[in-house]
């Protein structure tokens, strides 16, 4: 990147950027639907109402910060955003079908390296 005259955004393919912008709202809606089902299960469970209330409040506070709920849309952050969606379980690698092979391979490599790092394997 340094010295090659290209910025990070120049390396993002236009087709990948358009696909990301079109799929992100769909992925977010599906993720929030999943969260709503989890919240309903939490509230419908056994236990004191106060415990369920405070657990729901804690979960919502954490969940609303995830990329599946809110995400800063910028071309320069697209790859990091996709990694966040993948690592948070909002989407799977299979849902990257249609993106460029180069991008999918790059994300898979980073995720594999991250898993190796988390498990102490180098």
Regions found by a protein language model. Give the residues of each.
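Acidic, Ser/Pro/Thr-rich low-complexity regulatory regions
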Residues: 2-122
């Amino acid at each position: 990147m340094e010295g090659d005259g290209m910025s990070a955004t120049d390396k993002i393919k236009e087709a990948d950027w358009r696909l990301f912008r079109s799929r992100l709202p769909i992925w977010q809606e599906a993720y929030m639907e999943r969260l709503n089902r989890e919240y309903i299960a939490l509230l419908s469970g056994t236990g004191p109402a106060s415990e369920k209330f405070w657990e729901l409040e804690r979960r919502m506070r954490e969940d609303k910060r995830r990329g599946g709920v809110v995400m800063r849309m910028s071309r320069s952050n697209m790859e990091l955003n996709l990694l966040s969606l993948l690592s948070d379980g909002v989407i799977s690698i299979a849902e990257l079908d249609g993106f460029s092979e180069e991008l999918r391979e790059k994300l898979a490599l980073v995720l594999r390296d991250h898993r190796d790092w988390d498990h102490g394997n180098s």
